[in-house]
Amino acid sequence: MATTISELVDKIARLENQLVEELKKQQEEFHYTVEDNKIKFEQIILDTHRKLKVAILPWLKSATLRNVISSPSIYPMVIPIAFMDLTVTIYQNVCFRLYGISLVKRSNYVVMDRHNLGYLNGIEKFNCLYCGYGNGVIAYTREIIARTEQYRCPIKHARRVVGTHRRYANFVAFGDAEGYQTKRLEFRESLKDTD
């Protein structure tokens, strides 16, 4: 069974690499490059984007009532998200250094670049910043907690868990006391060289 899980994890890694290659093709298709984290479009694409942008007033007129009504309850969520961002950053900088765990690089997870798209108006850009930040912080937090789980309790649950993190598949099986005792320190050691 461990071999099957290992094979599946390897297959997922291969598929992730394949996804990266497909995204590179997409960059070529839409004529942009990313250099030093800066996005550069060809001029003809920038001109096309500007022509396709819907100005704020017509955009607001076409908005549905439910979207307008829900806005005041969406944006305040940035407060607990920012608080989580701050606290998990402090947590990992204190605890991970004490445990010898490699720090999670926040910039790999919190990516806010869609505001560079010329076909988005100001409100759409703001929405994209909000979602990029929120989802980025959640992914960043998840990786920090996943490393914590690997350090403290690398055991799978007895029940099926939906949406497990990428480290979970390698944890020891529920009930495998011997495996836990023999692999616990190995799991901790592997966190020192994690990127």
Residue ranges and their predicted role:
Residues A2-I45:
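Short, non-transmembrane cytosolic segments of multipass membrane proteins
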Residues K11-Q26, I56-P72, S102-V104:
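Short, charge-rich amphipathic segments
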Residues V34-P76:
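Compositionally biased, charge-rich terminal segments
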Residues Q43-R50, M84-I90, R106-V111:
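Short low-complexity stretches enriched in small and charged residues
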Residues K51, F96-S102, Y119-K125:
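A generic short-segment signal for beta-strand/edge and adjacent turn/coil regions
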Residues K53-V54, T89-V94, M112-N116:
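A broad, low-specificity signal for short, low-complexity segments enriched in glycine/proline
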Residues T64-S102:
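A transmembrane-helix-recognition feature enriched in membrane-embedded lipid enzymes
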Residues N108-D195:
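Cys/His-clustered metal-coordination modules, chiefly Zn-binding fingers
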